Amino acid sequence: RPSYSDYLIRILTASVYDVAVETPLEQARSLSGRLKNNILLKREDLQPVFSFKIRGAYNKMAKLPKESLARGVIAASAGNHAQGVALSAQRLGCRAVIVMPETSPQIKIDAVKNRGAEVVLKGVSYNDAYDHAMELAAKDNLTYIAPFDDPDVIAGQGTVGMEIVRQRADKIN
């Protein structure tokens, strides 16, 4: 497990801006007024896939060896991570297989397909989809892209924090 300083270095050197944009940090005026506190929102809904998940997926995939990208990647997700992996694969020119639960909303399935990924529907839960993704990864020699709990995914997603620090010179609680 990387140390905190290792993660900081990984965040500072993350490759996310080929697909992600630096999003604004905006005050939520109404919410701030109601709570009598300054509430800021990091507008990750402005990302190409409307979520911060693109950051982790792309950072992980951009760091894969060329041979791994040539074989392709696989992920299990019902939504935002799936779209992040699909867009990352599209940009990196590799095959992406996304295993989604059969209960996934059609709008999410279509969004993943529109990014060029192959969608496999399996089971009724994330765990069912994950188990099947791991089977396919082993069978087809695909690299599994975790939605979390991977140092490169964490570092990519951690760029949100780096931007917040850069965007706010004053103390943030």
Feature map (PLM): residue ranges:
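PLP-dependent amino-acid enzyme catalytic core
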Residues: 1-173
